Curated annotation (Swiss-Prot):
Belongs to the thymidylate synthase family. Bacterial-type ThyA subfamily. This is Thymidylate synthase. The gene is thyA. Gene3D superfamilies: Thymidylate synthase/dCMP hydroxymethylase domain. Homodimer. One of its GO terms (molecular function) is thymidylate synthase activity. (6R)-5,10-methylene-5,6,7,8-tetrahydrofolate binds at residues 51, 169, 263. It catalyses: dUMP + (6R)-5,10-methylene-5,6,7,8-tetrahydrofolate = 7,8-dihydrofolate + dTMP. Catalyzes the reductive methylation of 2'-deoxyuridine-5'-monophosphate (dUMP) to 2'-deoxythymidine-5'-monophosphate (dTMP) while utilizing 5,10-methylenetetrahydrofolate (mTHF) as the methyl donor and reductant in the reaction, yielding dihydrofolate (DHF) as a by-product. This enzymatic reaction provides an intracellular de novo source of dTMP, an essential precursor for DNA biosynthesis. DUMP binds at residues 21, 126-127, 166-169, 177, 207-209. InterPro entries: Thymidate_synth/dCMP_Mease, Thymidate_synth/dCMP_Mease_dom, Thymidate_synth/dCMP_Mease_sf, Thymidylate_synthase, Thymidylate_synthase_AS. Pathway: Pyrimidine metabolism; dTTP biosynthesis. It comes from Phocaeicola vulgatus (strain ATCC 8482 / DSM 1447 / JCM 5826 / CCUG 4940 / NBRC 14291 / NCTC 11154). It is found in: Cytoplasm.
């Protein structure tokens, strides 16, 4: 994935040193965009092995509107543990906002269902947006959303998705985010009867933590390998009916995993 490696190189070349909330420190650039044509393969980084199980289970967890880590932990996924309270709760994070955004009449808005219906019945709409950035609810989230909102776009029978990510941990987080939203795009395309188009990833504060610099340099020394393909059970026609077993990654031949400490 040349786009991703180019981003790492840009940060190392142009980035400025900044202090951050975690106290770790970063090298950062502001504003970057990557585009992935999913017909060319599933955009899963090959210069280090990624834990696809975590990516799939997290996305299914979001789509169910769940905000407690029990489901993740039951499936061997620990990526949210650092932010959970003693009961495993994370507050009104992604899943809550996607499926239960509070309205002003005491009810809730299921943004995912509304987006699906709009794609089916009004595909030329410029309002097919799902937002996790609920300003009135930020204080009720254990971690405010980094990938803040996304928009669908339909043209010539192809569905594309653009994500705006306000804060991008380029070594640890961004490879997960690319794969997660590319998978979401494939799933929505299937349930709406469209072909898969482009995933466009727009980044705000785009950074490498200073304790990841050696890992990044190691990753940049590795030659990218051909992208894998993601096969999805074609019988699933409802976005909320997908299970982990409905996904099969084929021809993934990554370099070995590179460990890095998450900054909390």
């Amino acid at each position: 994935m040349k786009q991703y490696l180019d981003l790492l190189n840009r940060i190392l070349t142009e980035g400025v040193h900044k202090e951050d909330r975690t106290g770790t420190g970063t090298i950062s650039v502001f504003g970057h965009q990557m585009r992935f044509n999913l017909e060319e393969g599933f955009p899963l980084v090959t210069t280090k092995k990624l834990h696809l199980k975590s990516i799939i289970h997290e996305l299914l967890w979001f789509l169910q509107g769940d905000t407690n880590v029990k489901y993740l932990q039951d499936n061997g996924v620990r990526i949210w543990n650092e932010w959970a309270d003693a009961n495993g709760d994370l507050g009104h994070i992604y899943g809550y906002q996607w499926r239960s955004w509070p309205d002003y009449n005491g009810g809730f808005i299921d943004q995912i269902s509304e987006a699906i219906e709009t794609i089916k019945h009004n595909p030329d709409s410029r309002r097919i947006i799902v937002s996790a950035w609920n300003v009135a609810d930020l204080n009720n989230m254990n971690l405010p959303p980094c990938h803040a909102f996304f928009q669908f776009y339909v043209a010539n029978g192809r569905l594309s998705l653009q994500l705006y990510q306000r804060s991008a941990d380029t070594f640890l987080g961004v490879p997960f985010n690319i794969a997660s939203y590319a998978l979401l795009l494939q799933m929505v395309a299937q349930v709406t009867g469209l072909q898969t188009g482009d995933f466009v990833h727009t980044l705000g504060d785009t950074h490498i933590y200073t304790n990841h610099l050696e890992q990044v340099k190691l990753q940049l020394s590795r030659e990218p390998r051909p992208l894998p393909q993601m096969k999805i059970n074609p019988d699933i026609k409802d976005i909320f009916s997908f299970k982990y077993e409905d996904f099969e990654l084929v021809n993934y031949d990554p370099w070995p995993h590179i460990a890095g400490k998450v900054s909390v």
